[in-house]
Every structure is written in structure tokens, then in C-alpha cells.
């Protein structure tokens, strides 16, 4: 475990992990595990999975309580602007998480330490680890320092959520089921591209490509809106 990380978390956020193995896991990339199999390490992908869900509900609850008069669509748009690659990667860098992630030599050489999708995953993994170690109150306390002040300052109000815009456009005259289908994952692990179609029934409305599924879905929704409004 990096003593500097432990010290910085304590000094900046008042966080002290009970189970340092969880913190260690959160900052261990799969490329590092693959290059050090003899150590029997675990990468942060499972914690990322958990942290993604924890962040979704934490931000959702905050917005629901803070804006009691807002309609669902407006809440969804703001949440999508917060719970996304651009924002999470920014939070990761502000917290200096990029300094402590353990990477394999190949990923380090390819500039992964500055890659937005990796930093997003790292932020989610950290919150997943914090949730397991101390519960959701600890996550809320951390997010109250890192994210909530930015919401109150209006930093996310100008970001566009194309998925919600597409949903509202298509559902003007009633409920319509919209489906996003992953077509392919192409490229090496350090430069993976996801291809997604957005459909209503069997009709493909648009296709998109992105560095993760969320970004690809947004790109597909944007393309669908452009074609529907043409």
C-alpha cells in the first residue's frame, strides 16, 4: 500500500480505511495484475462495478432531495452530466488518484495514467471500496466534499445528455421503449472502442462509437436525434 495515498486521503478528506487491502485493490489496474501474477493480486474491476451503482444512487438521492420541484427529465439530465466519463475523470484528477494507480509497464508507456476512461473507472472503484469498508454514509461524506459543491455552483448545467433528449423527443406522444445494443468492442485494452446501436423495435435510429459503453450510447443518441430532426 502506498503510504502517500493513505496520508493524502486522511489529510484531504478525513478518510482512513479499516481494510487497506480494499484500498490497494481499488488502485490496481488489470494490466498491473497481468504483469505480476506471482503476487496473486486482484484488479479493481469488481470494485468499479460496485462503485458505479453506489455513485448512481448517491447522486440520484442528492438531486431528488435538493430539487423537490424538478420533473424527472430535468433530474435525469443533470445526473447524466455528473455521472459520466468527463466528470468522474475530472474528480479523479482533482483528488490526485491518477498519481497512485498501479499500472503495467505497457499501459504506463501508452499514457493510461491520463486516460479519461481509466480515471473514471478508478473513481468508481475507490467509491466501491469505500462503500464496502465504511458504508454509504462515508461515500456521501466524500462526495459531499468532491461533487456536491460543484452541483450547487452550477458547473454541470450546460452539459448535454443526448439519451434523455432522445427519450423525451420520442415519447412526446406516449411511452416508447428505446433499446441500446452493444454491437462490438474493438481495439487493444488501452485503446478500446465500443460500437452501439439505438433502436425502437427493429428500427435502428442511430449508431455511435465511444471509449466506453456510456459514451457510445450518448453518441448513438446524438446521431439518432440529428437524423430524426433532419
From Swiss-Prot:
One Gene Ontology term, aspect cellular component = cytoplasm
Q: What is this protein called?
A: Ribonuclease 3
Family matches, as Gene3D superfamilies: 3.30.160.20, Ribonuclease III domain (1.10.1520.10)
Catalytic activity reported: Endonucleolytic cleavage to 5'-phosphomonoester
List, from the UniProt record, the residues annotated as the active site of this protein.
Answer: 52, 124
> Its gene?
rnc
Q: Where in the cell is it found?
A: Cytoplasm
Pfam families found in the cross-reference section: dsrm, Ribonucleas_3_3
Q: Give the main EC class.
A: hydrolase
Its family remark reads:
Belongs to the ribonuclease III family.
An example GO BP is: tRNA processing
PROSITE patterns, sorted: DS_RBD, RNASE_3_1, RNASE_3_2
Task: Describe its function.
Answer: Digests double-stranded RNA. Involved in the processing of primary rRNA transcript to yield the immediate precursors to the large and small rRNAs (23S and 16S). Processes some mRNAs, and tRNAs when they are encoded in the rRNA operon. Processes pre-crRNA and tracrRNA of type II CRISPR loci if present in the organism.
Q: Which InterPro entries match?
A: dsRBD_dom, RNase_III, RNase_III_dom, RNase_III_sf
The record's listing under CDD domains reads: DSRM_RNAse_III_family, RIBOc
Q: Which keywords does this chain's UniProt record carry?
A: Cytoplasm, Endonuclease, Hydrolase, Magnesium, Metal-binding, mRNA processing, Nuclease, RNA-binding, rRNA processing, rRNA-binding, tRNA processing
Q: State the source organism's domain of life.
A: Bacteria
Source organism of this protein record: Latilactobacillus sakei subsp. sakei (strain 23K)
Q: Where does the RNase III domain start and stop, copy by copy?
A: 6-135
Q: What is the annotated quaternary arrangement, including any partners?
A: Homodimer.
A single GO molecular function, which one? metal ion binding
- UniProt-listed Enzyme Commission number(s): 3.1.26.3
Q: Which cofactor does it need?
A: Mg(2+)
